[in-house]
Amino acid sequence: MAQEQKIYLVTAVFSVAPSGRRSENKILLFSPAGNLILTHYKYGGNFMEGTVEGNKIIKSVHTTYGDLSAIICWDGDFPSIVKQVGKSGAGILFVPASDWKEIDPAHSIVTVFRGIENGCSVVRQTRNGLSVMTDPRGKIIARMDHFKNSSWVTVGNVPMKKWFSLYPVIGDLFGWLSFLGLFYFICRSFIKRNVSFR
């Protein structure tokens, strides 16, 4: 289909293995020439679905639309791993997903944060949940709620260029420094209060 339509095609594949082997949950990216240019195996939540666990290495591929990267659904809940997307320079992150009503839209919101942290646009197509397309700052460009629409098509144009973000470099350092600062001021206040009561 990619070759026939002259498009980059991103597709999620859940292959059911014969008994005794583990099934695979993976994403495939094909070039307009029909070549498979990226494969990613899901690494998040495999214990629940009994699938082969990916190696937690997130690849990106250079295309005419800039650098593209992809993860699957629950993979987005691991910022320390997803920051590879920001380090790779990917401008667009594809996230095919399958949620359920009770968790919707939590995973979609988390994925928007992964885009902000890594300075990339996000295209999250969700079965049984909220599909979103965002720019690198988290602005919603398009959205579609699977439970409120009969036509499950989301259309939008996302920026292709990566925006600068410190998160891939420093990770959660700012958060930890803020926590330590808060702890310091609480201790200082407590000590000052005890000294003044003497």
Name each model feature, range by range.
Residues 156-162, 178:
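A conserved amphipathic helix/loop scaffold
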Residues 196-198:
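Cytoplasmic C-terminal tails of single-pass
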Residues 1-11, 20-22, 67-155, 174:
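CN hydrolase (nitrilase-like) catalytic-core segments centered on the catalytic cysteine
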Residues 13-15:
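Beta-strand C-termini and the immediately following turn/loop, strongest in propeller blades
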Residues 18-88, 149:
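Active-site catalytic loop in hydrolytic enzyme cores
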Residues 101, 163-164:
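Membrane-proximal extracellular juxtamembrane segment immediately upstream
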Residues 168-193:
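Selective detector of the "anchor" transmembrane alpha-helix that sits immediately C-terminal
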